[in-house]
UniProtKB/Swiss-Prot annotation:
Record-annotated disulphide pairs: none
Listed name of the protein: Amidophosphoribosyltransferase
Oxidoreductase keyword on record: no
Superkingdom classification of source: Bacteria
CDD domains referenced in this protein's UniProt entry, alphabetically: GPATase_N, PRTases_typeI
Functional description taken from the UniProt entry: Catalyzes the formation of phosphoribosylamine from phosphoribosylpyrophosphate (PRPP) and glutamine.
EC number(s) on file: 2.4.2.14
Enzymatic reactions: 5-phospho-beta-D-ribosylamine + L-glutamate + diphosphate = 5-phospho-alpha-D-ribose 1-diphosphate + L-glutamine + H2O
Family: In the C-terminal section; belongs to the purine/pyrimidine phosphoribosyltransferase family.
MF terms (GO), sorted A to Z: amidophosphoribosyltransferase activity
Domain Glutamine amidotransferase type-2 per the UniProt entry, residue ranges: 22-241
Enzyme active site: C22 (nucleophile)
SUPFAM superfamilies on file: N-terminal nucleophile aminohydrolases (Ntn hydrolases) (SSF56235), PRTase-like (SSF53271)
Amino acid sequence: MNQSHSFPTDDPLDGDTLHEECGVFGILGHPDAAALTALGLHALQHRGQEAAGIVSFDGKRFYQERHMGLVGDHYTNPMTLARLPGSISIGHTRYSTTGEVAMRNVQPLFAELEEGGIAIAHNGNFTNGLTLRRQIIATGAICQSTSDTEVVLHLIARSRHASTSDRFIDAIRQMEGGYSMLAMTRTKLIAARDPTGIRPLVMGELDGKPIFCSETCALDIIGAKFIRDVENGEVIICEIQPDGSISIDARKPSKPQPERLCLFEYVYFARPDSVVGGRNVYTTRKNMGMNLAKESPVDADVVVPVPDGGTPAALGYAQESGIPFEYGIIRNHYVGRTFIEPTQQIRAFGVKLKHSANRAMIEGKRVVLVDDSIVRGTTSLKIVQMIREAGAREVHIRVASPMIFFPDFYGIDTPDADKLLANQYADVEAMAKYIGADSLAFLSINGLYRAVGGEDRNPARPQFTDHYFTGDYPTRLLDKNGESMGNKLSMLASNG
């Protein structure tokens, strides 16, 4: 296999936002498979900016390109795409939540099996990945990366089933957590989604060839047709037959569970033009802002979004409240990201590199700042300072999601619980004082549910994954202090 390398550069990073782990894209049977995969990954760049990789197969051998950095930094080069021939391809954009930032962790990961090679790309996180890794190492396995995705390759290799498809299914039956996953062999493209449906995965079609990707925006960029969402717990096996036709076999190997898609796909992660779970993301975010205005009104002169995530919600807030909307903060979209762990001091400095106050829209006014979420509060603090320096008379923060109390273990890069702003202060008033705002309010959990799904949260059977707000984890967390960790956190939430 070919493998290309490049090296990371250090760029400023805002460490007060949540980050999704990955985006995946795969296509089977198309002569321009790698080029289409690169375009799909470009549309999914928001899901991971640390690294991107593509694997292809041309009927004889597998080819691989893996690079640190953005998709456009490498895969717009015709020479790079020329090194990825073939009609089968999968690709991956990465933001690490498990495993260090290193070339050996850049996906897709590849392994040679007795019946041929297999490559895997994975979005999400396995909550028993570390436990399984320790088990396979104890029995003689040698791991080449620190990514939890590699565990799947080992389980596939150890499976006693005859076909690669059955080996793959045998492996994912042992995995717990939230994931969407693509695998490719010499003739197959396999898609899988976790039994709870925490991470999204969609199926599309271009020129009669099947496509799987994290979001519909990756279908739109190449003019592909959306077919349907991959169902929770579903495995879809697409295979090129000897006559050139493509067979599609959909299976449900896991015990059916109620789907609980991650709410943060709507709050922050998914691109606004994507359709996730049958819902336009932009519309749900605008609904969040409208509900926020109903729940937490304030006398003000202007509604200003914290770009870019807060923009749809700010539009909704302005529409519902009747307060004019203005771009009072301008974002620099050309500030890069870092591949080192930044200090809090560097994090705070990075805010001004990304955001500038538009004084003409702010000076002398009472400002409502609308953001999608608050994690540590460091960004909010600096933005409030910036808005006051630009002459705002009052600054009121409205957040289009509930307070975050609990860490995530399903593919979102969240701090430890004690680093979250909501756990550092006794009440919202104390948080507002820390940030320097005249007032602070968060959208209620029911307000969020109504914005996305049209009805209140069902506490007996929540319609979405919302553990970061409620402590109600949808699966056990075997790697985190044993099987009872999820129940303990849920009890903490109910007692809080």
